Amino acid sequence: NARWSGPDANGLEWLSRDPAVWDAFRADPLTTEVPLLKLFGPVEALRLYGRPRKHYPRDVPVLLMVGRDDPVGGPRSVHRLADDYRSRSGLTDVTTLVYPEARHEIFHELQQDEVRADLLAWLDTHVPPRG
């Protein structure tokens, strides 16, 4: 959160540019400040942070979406994950979308309409209709 530190900082600026998201986060009884390693233990945390498995079906489409200013993962991590899906898992259809100025909660960001529209458009082109 150093990027947004200052006398008026509340410690939640990393989530979103929308102050309503900070208020909702603070009010959520399921929110925790416990680090993931401590919360889940080393084995489960490694699964969250680890590399993707090998030998997925090659035609499984993957969409990775991230805010450019997300201090948790950010574009660098997402591009690395996309590369791992291609090289390690053998996937052939991996799409990454990076949202300028967006932070961690891209679906609760100021440009959430764009984020949702991109997701729906991607689903329309990658998931066949039922029935």
Whereabouts are the PLM-identified features?
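A general structural detector for well-ordered alpha-helical segments in enzyme core domains, enriched
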Residues: 81-84, 115
